[in-house]
Structures are given as structure tokens and as C-alpha cells.
Amino acid sequence: MRRLLVPTLAVSLTALIALPFVVLLMQSLARSWSYPALWPQRWQLEQWLVLGAAWPSLAAAAWRSLVLALLVALVATGAGFFTSRALTRSALRQRWLALALLPFAVPPVVYALSLAQAYAALGLNGHYGGVLLAQLPFAYGYAVLLCRGYWTRHSRALDELALSLGARPAQVWWRVHLPLARGLLGVCLFQTALMSWFDFALVRVIGAGHVETLTLKVFDYLGAGDLRQAAAAALLLLGPPCLALLANPRLLWPPVSRVSS
């Protein structure tokens, strides 16, 4: 029984993960699908043909979404990794951590509406720079939370060892910590990029209709009441993250740091 338990759990988990994608795919190919049928009664490619006709605008939105997500991830991960070291070694680390996580205490829509007036006065509404600045506090707080687990007594011992051997502080960062934290930083980059890639509220409010991302395109189809077209667009939205996970499954969870073992 125990030998069958692990394969059974693995198959069940895989089926649960794959089920939403299968439903989306069937919905995107459905012409008619009524309750209580388990699959569409009639099929068609019309939804995908419509996406093909709209491909230039979708590709442009996907490219802008990707650039925005990469910028948010790079800034948030870099700042989060370097500042989490000072945070974990501070006597007030719990207060600093609470401050870094403060944006998560406010719903994104409320946060965006609170910033909208100030951003309008600064001329940031309707610009990608404004959306970037609005997304950064959330991504940075998450990066700090994720990276602080790297800074343990062992990492401090490595600091002292490298410095005692004549390494400069910059060399300790580049030759010791960055190589050891490479896996963790990859996870942090991927997950903070996803926060920007799937963001809707901040892009909608701060972007003020002038910032187009692929997520907004999906919600536009939903707003139009075309669930089949929205399902096809949602598969396009999920495609890049899924391809990244297939290429490197370790992006899904933080690795156990070698300095903490």
C-alpha cells in the first residue's frame, strides 16, 4: 500500500493541476456547452481565429507585460535581497518587516485609488512608470519576506570567514552570497514577475486606460460577456509562466539554502 501511495498522490496532484487548463482549453474550443454536459456538445475554432486576427495587439500587450514584469522583478528582488540582510540583523527587525509587508494589509484596489490622485498630480497616471512604482511595494515586500530566510548565523559566519581571509565587502557579496543564493533569487525573480504579470487592479486604476497588458485584454473579453474568447485569451496569458516552469520546475518553490544546513 505504501508503495502505491506516492504514485497515487502524484497522479492525483497532477490531475488537479491540469484540470483547470483542460477546462479552459475545452471552453476555448466550444461552440455550445450547456449543463450538465461534461464536455462541449459542439466544437469550433472561431475563438482562436479571432485571437489570430487580433494577434498584433495581443503580442504588443504581451511584450509590454513582459517588460514591466521583468523590471518589477529585477528591482524588487535586488532591493529585497540586499535590504533583507540589514533587516534581519537589526534589533527592530520585526518592525521593519511589518513595515515592508504593510502594502499587503490594504486591498490593491483601495491602494490604487489612494495613489491615483497623487499620481495624477505628479503626471504618473496613464504611464508605465506609474504602474511600475505602484507595483513595486508589493513585489519588494514579498522579496524581503522570501530573502530574509537566507540570512542566518551561517551566512554571518561566511561573512566573517571571507573578511578574515582578506576579501572586500563587495567581493563577499559577489563571490559568496550571490552564488549561494542563486536558486533563491531565481525563485524570487519568477514570483515577483508573476505578481506584475497577473496584476489587474493597479494596472486598471493607475494605468487609466492608457497602459495595456495581456491581463487587461483577458478581462476585456470577460467584460464583454464572451467566456469562450476569454478562455482562449487566458490560455495565452498562462502560457509564458507555464513554459518557464516546464523549463525549470525549481522556480516554483525556494530551495533549501546550503548555508542554513
Could you describe each region identified by the protein language model?
Residues 2-34, 49-152, 180, 184-200, ...:
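Membrane-water interface segments at the C-terminal ends of transmembrane alpha-helices
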Residues 36-41, 199-228, 261:
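Glycine-rich helix-loop "coupling/hinge" segments at transmembrane-helix boundaries
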Residues 39-51:
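Luminal/periplasmic active-site loops of membrane-embedded glycosylation enzymes
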Residues 134, 159-160:
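Short alpha-helical segment that forms part of, or immediately flanks, the ligand-binding pocket
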Residues 153-158, 257:
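Short glycine/proline-centered loop/turn elements that form peptide/ligand docking sites
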Residues 160-181:
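Short helix-to-coil transition segments within interhelical loops
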Residues 251-261:
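Short cytosolic juxtamembrane segments of multi-pass membrane proteins
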